Amino acid sequence: GVIGLGAIGVLVANAASELGMEVFGCDPYLSIQNAVRLSHHITIVKDNDEIYNQCDYITIHVPALDSTKGMLNKRTFDQMKDGVKILNFARDILVNDADMADALANGKVSRYVTDFPNPAVVNMPGALVLPHLGASTEESEENCAVMAVNQIMDYLENGNIENSVNYPSCSLGYRKKTARICVCHYNRPNVISQLTSLFGEAGVNISDMVSKSRGEYAYAMFDVE
């Protein structure tokens, strides 16, 4: 079971499916872009409880938010199969360490694999703790810095968004000689139709446009003449 079908979660789900596993995935904010990349062999379920109830292996790939802090805890462990294996390479605070220690001790969880070592986790019987590398090397830090600068420049010069925390990835490519208008808005019905009506009333022609949404936020780009 894969909880969180973002860029990494989709890759994990597809890889597990290619290994011959029956894969369940859950993500209430699954983007169209990631849905297209997801193998058709993956079963999408409506909530995490279905994964807790059915899966022998559970891996989490969600951000650290108030709503996800300690999401794996005694209540959710009690829903899982006996002997479940859990993988956490996302964020350390997603797992309640004390409840995980109890679940490992009583056999509810047979193995906990993570790359977030701390004194509690490294002393848990049944925990397989790996080094957390991330962007710790000099080369990766430099690459991350260059990538961040390029993405900020692309937004400032062209209005394109990539790898935003709250907004969807959205691009119209390089800005042409025409003007480009970018609108950040809540993901509500009829916003795009209202915007295009305003352009029409002002006698502005739309030569190209794109609109993407992610959760409660959306982003629209218009090339106008």
Can you say where each PLM-predicted feature lies in the sequence?
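N-terminal Rossmann-fold NAD(P) dinucleotide-binding loop
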Residues: 9-10
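Rossmann-like adenosine-cofactor binding region
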Residues: 30-121, 136
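Glycine-rich Rossmann-fold phosphate-binding loop(s) that bind the pyrophosphate
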Residues: 5-6
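Conserved acidic E/D residue at the C-terminus of a beta-strand in Rossmann-like folds
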Residues: 27
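NAD(P)-dependent dehydrogenase/reductase Rossmann-like domain
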Residues: 112, 122-125, 133-225
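Residues at the starts of beta-strands that form the adenosine-phosphate
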Residues: 21-22
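Hydrophobic Val/Ile/Leu positions in short beta-strands of Rossmann-like dinucleotide-binding domains
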Residues: 1-2, 183
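Aromatic pocket-lining residues of Rossmann-like dinucleotide-binding sites
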Residues: 15-16, 80
